[in-house]
């Protein structure tokens, strides 16, 4: 769909007066180079020798972006926008949790951690970018574009690692055990992750089990640099919030209110303790 659909869109756009296309790609076209801690994927990069084994979605987006780029020779005028890992609206946490059968991998990762109360240690960079920042970025740099043939990274310029994200989630009041990835893998294979006294299962645990069986390790990796894009947007009054307790707490609260995330155990809740102390 990504490839054929893009071909159709390019064909249609070439028949318009302006021949202009704001193409929404993804930062994950970096493919397996994201596993390399030496990788810094910049807006000026496209083909960096990446592979796509077991990464069919990323391959299709890479090919689709290539179609757009090559269509410049046919007269297509374009800008490419590469969003990161999109979460809810920054101030309210609003996100269509539970409104469809597919909630999203990144939310399911958090749900798995909060319910099983276990996560593995990892230095992989984990992007958390609010949907309103992404949408405003597309509007400002894609629709109100001052330049053409540019690529913009709509990821959070505040770069953090997976373990930092989990530690921040724990600060909102959830007891989370952080263990080495090897131990987490054993628990996955031996079905020792528990929820309400039963074997814990989720889309995330299924994905991890699949990755681990194929020798894919998620211990470290490169990151997507969005400093240039963030600077341009800041000049237009568009700022991305940092990945901190305030932002993650907003997402957690919204998820709890929607019945998607489990509630913080009251006796272990830092928030509840703070409320009682201030009463």
Predicted ranges, named:
Residues 3-9, 60-68, 109:
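Conserved catalytic Lys-bearing alpha helix of Rossmann-like short-chain dehydrogenase/reductases
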Residues 4-56, 79-80:
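Conserved Rossmann-fold NAD(P)-dependent oxidoreductase catalytic core, especially the SDR/UDP-sugar
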Residues 48-52, 98-133, 137-141:
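A conserved pocket-lining segment of Rossmann-fold NAD(P)-dependent short-chain dehydrogenase/reductase
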Residues 62-97:
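Conserved beta-loop-beta element that borders a ligand/cofactor-binding pocket
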Residues 88-105, 141-152:
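Glycine/proline-rich active-site loop of Rossmann-fold NAD(P)-dependent oxidoreductases
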Residues 123-136, 152-175, 182-199, 220, ...:
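Substrate-binding strand-loop-helix patch
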Residues 131, 163-164, 190-237:
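Conserved C-terminal active-site "lid" loop/helix of NAD(P)H-dependent oxidoreductases
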Residues 223-279:
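Amphipathic terminal alpha-helices
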